[in-house]
Amino acid sequence: MPNFKSKKIKEINLPYSKDDVEFLWLAKNDNVSLIYTKVQEESFFLQIKKAQNGFVIKGDKHTKPSKIGYLQKALKIFKEGFCEDIINEAFGLKNNALIEKTPFIVDNFDELLSRLQGKIYIEIGFGSGRHLLYQAKENPNVLILGVEIYNPALTQVAKLAKAQNVNNILLIQSDARLLLSVLKSKSVEKIFLHFPVPWDKKPHRRVIGKDFCKECARVLTQNGRFELRTDSFEYFNFTLEQFLTFPVPKFSLRKNENLEISSKYEDRWKKQEKNIYDLWVWNFNQECKNYELNEFNLSSVEFSKEDLKKIEQNFKNITIKKDDFFLHFESIYKQDENLLLKVAFGAFNKPEHCYLHLDKTIDFAFKEPFKIQENIKAINELKEILKVQFKI
């Protein structure tokens, strides 16, 4: 994560803008200050954290922009405008950094849904993008949707797609399990999962699980196919066991088969003479219904100035666990007379993190989370907890 350390920070008078970067407002607690930052069409927090002999300034990891160049540019402007005596820095805004809006990266779920049409393939964890771009070139009439949790991978593959004149891809930063849960039933032709982290010693951290397999079965078309490629026999066998729970699945199992395209990980494993396993699954024959997306309905909550004072005074780092969701109040920040809450919530295997802005009403400081049932339940619980636990 790009960052730098400064001995001194000047007085921060906001709003402040320069070179398409805007610093609009600041929220803080005893240890951390968050600056609401806009670069072109994206918003995120810069984080200022007290450290030994100075301050560390970096991007907040739960709101970081989809383009690393946006964060680098914001850090550069903040350093020049508000910092003195720079101790060290670990960022550099390169001339070829991806700053301009690219059509290949979608920033949120609503934008993604509006652009999904026709045949769709999904690649989970596309990494360097070799296989994703190969599929896009081989299938020009198919939309290749890549989902990845690491921002640098999105930027890198978007650059490659532009350079190679590949136009039938979409990239989104997300947990794959979240993405699948909001796609329409029977809308995807293929799902690729190539060389996932095997987590052989911590299988609970694998993306593969019963719920994930059910979601694959739901979103795949009647003849749609899930394809796993892995160097871990344990992962291969675990995945097979999960899909064997379906009534009449069909499988294709292969070992050490060379494909037309090879990832950098596959090249490495082959040099080490490791075995490579392929598992294809189809014919799920499962009746599925589209989920109805409810609203978070935050408009029903209103606060007085006295309410906000009580929330600030009584705030505790607490976690509430229910059968199918959780809610964790992580931190609270003061923003003038208003408050900012950082919370984690949702399904246990698909947690969300977000900031909630509290003034007379309550709203998400950034984009809304995915509207899956576990998230809806967690936000409803949050509204009740604000009244009961924090005594307003």
Swiss-Prot record:
Sorted UniProt keywords: Methyltransferase, S-adenosyl-L-methionine, Transferase, tRNA processing
Alphabetical list of Pfam families matching this protein: Methyltransf_4
Catalytic activity of the protein: guanosine(46) in tRNA + S-adenosyl-L-methionine = N(7)-methylguanosine(46) in tRNA + S-adenosyl-L-homocysteine
Top-level taxonomic group: Bacteria
Keyword Metal-binding in record: no
Cellular component GO terms held in the UniProt record: tRNA methyltransferase complex
A GO MF term: tRNA (guanine(46)-N7)-methyltransferase activity
Record has Transit peptide as a keyword: no
Pathway(s) it belongs to: tRNA modification; N(7)-methylguanine-tRNA biosynthesis
Binding site for S-adenosyl-L-methionine: 123, 148, 175
Documented EC number(s): 2.1.1.33
Binding residues annotated for substrate, in chain numbering: 201, 231
Biological role: Catalyzes the formation of N(7)-methylguanine at position 46 (m7G46) in tRNA.
Family recorded in the similarity comment: Belongs to the class I-like SAM-binding methyltransferase superfamily. TrmB family.
NCBIfam families referenced in this protein's UniProt entry, alphabetically: PRK14121.1 (NF010719), tRNA (guanosine(46)-N7)-methyltransferase TrmB (TIGR00091)
Listed name of the protein: tRNA (guanine-N(7)-)-methyltransferase
Organism: Campylobacter jejuni (strain RM1221)
